[in-house]
Amino acid sequence: MWPVGSSYTRACSVQRWPKRCVYWAPSPQNVLEINPHRFQESRRSAALYRKHVVESKLNLIKKELLKAELDNVVQTNLANSQAITDYLTTLEDLANILVDRAQQPASSNQGGARPQTDPHVPQPAPAIPSAPPKENTTTVVIAPGDSGYTFSTNFLREFLSGLYATSASWLPSYGPWFTAMTANAMQRRVFPKELKGTANLKNSTSLKLITEVLTTVASINVDFYTDLRNLSDFNAALCILNAYYCKTQGHPLPASREELLDNLGPKIAALVADIKGLGSDSNITFTFTFSSGQQAATIAPVNGDGRYNKDFFSNHKIFRLLVAKEVVLLPNFTNVPGATDGPDYIYALTSALFSDNIPPFGNYQLNLRSGIKGVEYLILVYLTLANAQLSKPDGRRLHLKALLGAAFEHSSKVQLFKRDEVFTFLMKEYVLPILSHNNNISTTELFPGMALAALEVGNQINFDPNKHFVNLAGTKFTKIFNVLNQKLMFKDVRELLVAKSELRVALENGLAATLNSIAPVNAVVEVIQKQFGGGDDYDRLYFLVLGCLPVTVAVV
């Protein structure tokens, strides 16, 4: 017989569920009721909220972009107003001086005889009216022996506008590529009306159309990000080339931005020679490795930390060489103990010559990507002009005397140029003045012709070279036209960024296709000759700078 006390103790120690847990206890009496109307209403409310959040973010982005654009317009108008005010002030001073001079003889005649002056006493010199302030201009020279070109804001735009000064007698024609582009643009239903001028129907291309197309091509590598950490692809490429040359050759780092361009030809040649020494591994090319379709369609890293995936640069020849020479310091890509403890030459250049806000390229890899592609761009420009001879007009298309009139002068002296001499001249007389005018310029703004040539080579690799046919689809112009449509018609900021990113990725693919070919220089020369009419080194030099080779066509 159990003791009464122990039974009572066990009964009291039995654990009981709290009342709030009764509803969750398994029981056939528990029923879950879902009101379909409330469920649909909740889904609708959630969708509306998500749509509201997305629209709020888009409106905020548009407001910021509009604010920046309006600020630029205000600054431009303020500068123009200040210039007009200065001119008016100068004119007023000149008018007052002339009035005072006119009144002095009259007052002296009314007073009788002129006062006697001592000839030995020095008299004050007459006041000389100050000349009006000169407009801020820049002068560049493209080819040795040619006249220089003076421009105020944009060299390409001002050069193109000068070609249409005598449009009543003749118009410029730009070659097969631009003829096909113009015809394709005129046949499109969705295309800006302001670009469909009457000149497009006279075996020519209107000023507005050629200007917008070449401006779009020239702005491909212009960063549309507003981050202070960004560096233009041209400046990033200069930093990489100089850091590589100083690291491998033992030279001191440049002390100014102008010194970055000194001996740029030998610096590129040293890098090209080392690239050729890497061997012929089919897996190591000039292309990046994309881990997702989203990253393949954008320029900036998809990851939020400013870095690409680990294997993004791994199969790129220039990156492999930079890591092997310890110019780019990334711990994940080197097996040398203590290699990352050495000096970062690239960071030393960017922090000393540009800004302290620019982080090392290994941490902010957008600059590394744009810099590597900028190096590819400059390599192609250098190789195209390395052995250029400009004195032999064999099959030359461009005759600037007929285009520009008596203002243009060309030396008829026969001159033989050494290797790299034309390229060095171009860096000194063309790139350096423009760089002092705009220190954040991109490679495509300097050499839009190379962008067109690379895009054309990239389009050609998609077709079978053994099959000869004429491409009538005009798809190679689509990416350029998409940017024009979004910029001038739809004006959707988000879609404009997408269109610009697609065009820049296409240029990267074109540069890679050109450098991966058996003879990159021959590929560029062939495209310039067949698509744009370039016949000799003189034509190719001007095509790289202008992006076109105009000739005169009579108006009928």
From Swiss-Prot:
Regions of biased composition (Pro residues) lie at 121-132
Q: Pfam families this protein is in?
A: Herpes_UL25
Q: What is its main location?
A: virion
Q: Where would you find this protein in the cell?
A: Virion; Host nucleus
| Region (Disordered) location | 104-136
| Keyword Transcription regulation recorded | no
Residues covered by region (Interaction with major capsid protein/MCP): 1-54
One Gene Ontology cellular component annotation held by this UniProt entry: viral capsid
Q: Which domain of life is it from?
A: Viruses
An example GO BP is: symbiont entry into host cell
The protein's UniProt keywords, in alphabetical order, are:
Capsid protein, Host nucleus, Host-virus interaction, Viral genome packaging, Viral penetration into host nucleus, Viral release from host cell, Virion, Virus entry into host cell
What role does this protein play? Capsid vertex-specific component that plays a role during viral DNA encapsidation, assuring correct genome cleavage and presumably stabilizing capsids that contain full-length viral genomes. Participates in the interaction between the capsid and the tegument through interaction with the large tegument protein/LTP.
Which family does the similarity line name?
A: Belongs to the herpesviridae CVC2 protein family.
* Quaternary data: Heterodimerizes with CVC1. Interacts with major capsid protein/MCP and triplex capsid protein 1/TRX1 at the pentamer vertices. Interacts with the large tegument protein/LTP.
Q: Which HAMAP family match?
A: HSV_CVC2 (MF_04025)
Q: What is this protein called?
A: Capsid vertex component 2
Its gene?
A: CVC2
